Amino acid sequence: MFQNGLSSSPSNTTEPFSGPNFPLISIRDNVKAGYKLVTEVFGVKRIYGVVGFSMGAQQAFQWGVSYPNFVEKIVGIAGSAVEYPHGQVRLEGFIAAIQADNSFNEGNYNSPPEIGLRAGGAHWASWGWSQEWYRQGLYKEMELNSPSDVINWFEEFVLTWDANNLIALARTWQNNNVGNTPGFNGDYSKALKSIKAEVLYMPSETDMYFHIEALTQEAEKIPGVKLRIIPSLWGHIAGAGFSSDDAEFIDQEIKEFYK
């Protein structure tokens, strides 16, 4: 995915598009690049399945809209086809946490803005899992002993990333909307109804990034959809494989879907 530090990203692109000057990339841009790769480089004529978690799920749904005759089956795990207003505000909070560090210097930093990155990690720690996950102390299943340990865990994770890369990814996430695909004039309902692939739509019951009500409404608009809600207290992280129960549920549903 663009901006992840491996593909073209603010951290590895030369001037004039390096750092904070990196252009806004859409989910659709990522999917278009993937399509060109598999068709022009590998000569693939049709894809049997696309599977994605979180921003990968955003891409999976976009594959179905952008290339309706190219993909047979789509699995979207804990992700949406549209980023709704509350999610956009939440992401702005994450971005603001990083930018509040004086050493961020509008993205022109000489060393990682560690204070801002840690603040971003603390932000994510409050959103990644459900309230009940914290109340029941399920963090102990990750060999963590307290909510403070969870914050430290997420801070250390965020510190492994480049700040401009994270902000660029957040902007991509903020602006996601399959309705912006050419031909749909911003109408995401129409875009979802155009999907011809079979779709396994798997939201997490307690996801605080992608709210279950919005996702079930999205699923209802897709003609060939199979909605399977992950019955988990792990929030968004239910799709990341940390819980063996969640991983087993997801694996079994995908196996059944691909029969």
Each predicted region: which residue ranges?
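Gly/Pro-rich cap/lid or specificity-loop segments adjacent to the active site
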Residues: M1-Q59, V65, N69-A81, H86-L91, ...
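Alpha/beta-hydrolase-fold enzymes
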Residues: F70-E156
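Detector for conserved single-position "signature" residues within domains
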Residues: A78, A96-S103, G121, M202, ...
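Active-site nucleophile elbow and catalytic-triad environment of alpha/beta-hydrolase enzymes
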Residues: W153, A168-A191
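Conserved alpha/beta-hydrolase "acid-adjacent" motif
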Residues: F184, M208-A214
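Short, conserved loop/helix-junction motifs that constitute active-site signature segments
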Residues: L192-K196, E220-P223
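Short beta-strand/loop motif that positions the catalytic acidic residue
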Residues: I195, Y201-P203
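Catalytic active-site module of serine/aspartate enzymes centered on a nucleophile-bearing elbow/loop
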Residues: T216-E220, G224-K259
